[in-house]
Amino acid sequence: SPLYALHNLVLAKAAAPPCPDAVRLTLDRAPAPAEVTDFMMRGEDDPGAWDNFYSELCTKLARGAAEVWAVRREGALVSTAGAYALSPDTAYLAAVETLEALRGQGIGGWLTGLLAADLAARGRRVALSCKKERLNFYHRLGFAAEDTVQRYALDGLPEEK
């Protein structure tokens, strides 16, 4: 099983970049859970994956243990970011996703920066884990390294993104 590193980061200074396409992009601070699930599960082959994600998301949202934001372009979801583990003092970001055709345009960075800054302004420590390839993305948004952990990818199971 291959070994890989996950880098744990914490928001040091909020740095939300400007909206990259203000004419056509709109921020949605409470997208419908089914729509978020459709977006996150597109291309997923496991028939139970949609149900599992949706059920967990609905439960966390209902309990105040998660918050998900999205960006829409001409009404359609094109990017999401979420704090999928919320406590009174900490928010763990995960599942930052932008449609592949729109990556590299600053949409995901804008959304993640806004969500992180908002959570921090409400008194939460904002943290996340990412692979080495994503470090520069998060550093530009004001995140700083906290520590690194080693993980094993089990044969036959997909690695975490």
Predicted segments — roles?
Residues S1-P2, G109, K132-V149:
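Conserved active-site alpha-helix within GNAT-family acetyltransferase domains
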Residues A94, T98-E100, G104-A121, R140:
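Conserved acetyl-CoA-binding loop-helix of GNAT-fold acetyltransferases
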Residues A22-D38:
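A short beta-loop-alpha structural element at the N-terminal edge
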Residues S1-R24, V149-L157:
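Acyl-donor-binding surface of acyltransferase catalytic domains
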Residues D38-N52:
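Helix-loop element at the rim of GNAT/NAT acetyltransferase active sites that forms part
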Residues A76-T90, G123, A144-K161:
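Acyl-donor (CoA/ACP) binding surface of acyl/acetyltransferases
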Residues L119-K131:
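Conserved GNAT acetyl-CoA-binding A-motif
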Residues A49-E97:
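A conserved beta-strand-loop-helix scaffold within acyl/acetyltransferase catalytic domains
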